[in-house]
């Protein structure tokens, strides 16, 4: 291992952080090409799946190369031996999270099932669309931003700053408000950062992020960070904004913030697999 974290001169560390953020922001944009093409000219599902897998694989491959550039001989947070266990554990956490959140909103009178509409092709495409999103955003915000801040300034600073950046980058989304960005900062930014720190891999937050979006939109029928999707359930969402999140989606609800904060605290009070590192 070469110079990393607080061993680097500050200017070199800052250059790597800014360059990494800009480079992977562009890479994240390019990784969305299959989604953009499909919106204009629908692609057969099997082609879409392969394009999504290739796109996600390319992002992970480029991240591995970047880890060599910023001082590592390999990317320990992409350890293949942990892929299956952490990715699918994360997927389960995201699914349970949104099932519980939807139940809470329903109990508060803000959600009920209007109808159910099964569309296999739409569900499959949505599943792989949100895989691309989960991989790209976790590599950018946890693999680049959180990790480099953590190595330099420690976990608390990394968690706060990366979460704020993650939350407020969504301010440009449809129907976004300052509150929706604060909500994402707390419920998702903190949770995903805690999952990354606890597990020591990107696979766990990728799995959470992937299923979080998939169950939020294509399954339960909420807007995903302000963006409407085709969904299995066509819900009737009504009630005060603090209960439902309004047009931005359930992420902007108070129950989501409370539940996300609870899961974050649970991660930090559960013995960490990276107990030898700063927390």
Q: Language-model segments: what does each one mean?
A:
Residues 1-74, 217-279:
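N-terminal, membrane-interfacial amphipathic/helix-forming hydrophobic leader that caps
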Residues 14-18, 49-50, 87-92, 123-124, ...:
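Hydrophobic alpha-helical transmembrane segments
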Residues 21-27, 98-104, 163-172, 211-219:
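Aromatic-anchored segments of alpha-helical transmembrane domains
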Residues 29, 181-241:
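Functionally important transmembrane alpha-helices
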Residues 30-49, 70-139, 146-151:
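Juxtamembrane helix-loop-helix connectors linking adjacent transmembrane helices
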Residues 53-58, 123-128, 136, 183-187, ...:
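Membrane-embedded alpha-helical segments of multi-pass membrane proteins
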Residues 95, 99-101, 130, 134, ...:
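Small-polar-interrupted transmembrane alpha-helices in polytopic inner-membrane proteins
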